[in-house]
């Protein structure tokens, strides 16, 4: 199930309502200058920005030129949320195509600058991993994040547990949120 929206060419948030509600609750609980980092973008990106206060920030890291154009094209028309947003576009390198909804998307090859594009992202309060190489990205945030215990999510975890199970052993705790989202603790 997705959530219908009217965000230009984006007509849905590809998450369950209870997952969006949980994440927006976490955003509201961040400090007044809180930061969220997400890998992968879409209608949910706009929802996170609409939920944030003026001083909170969202950094989005995207590898897909199509999604980058859709999301940035829409957000650039919204002066009320644009100042909260930093978009980092890091396309796949070396000709590797990760694809969608198949195990190939989990391979970190060609994502040299995508996984950790700069160290400024490491102080976030929330990390939402919803792009490619999700297990690798979540694990890097566990070890590299500068906060004592940030919120780390992997979207679409449930239903693809075998893709991510190798990384789960390194987290102290995990909790199912909604239908497909998992929250992880350092």
Please give the residue ranges for each predicted region:
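Glycine-rich phosphate-binding "P-loop"
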Residues: 1-17, 25-29, 93-116
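Long, low-complexity, Lys/Arg-enriched
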Residues: 2-9, 13-17, 69-72, 165-176
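SAM cofactor-binding core of SAM-dependent methyltransferases
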Residues: 13-97
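Intrinsically disordered, low-complexity segments enriched in small/polar residues
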Residues: 29-32, 40, 108, 129, ...
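Short, charged, surface-exposed secondary-structure boundary motifs
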Residues: 67-74, 96-99, 161-167, 183-186
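Internal catalytic-core helix/loop-beta-alpha segment
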Residues: 85-140
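C-terminal substrate-binding/active-site "lid" region of AdoMet-derived donor-dependent transferases
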Residues: 118-121, 126-186
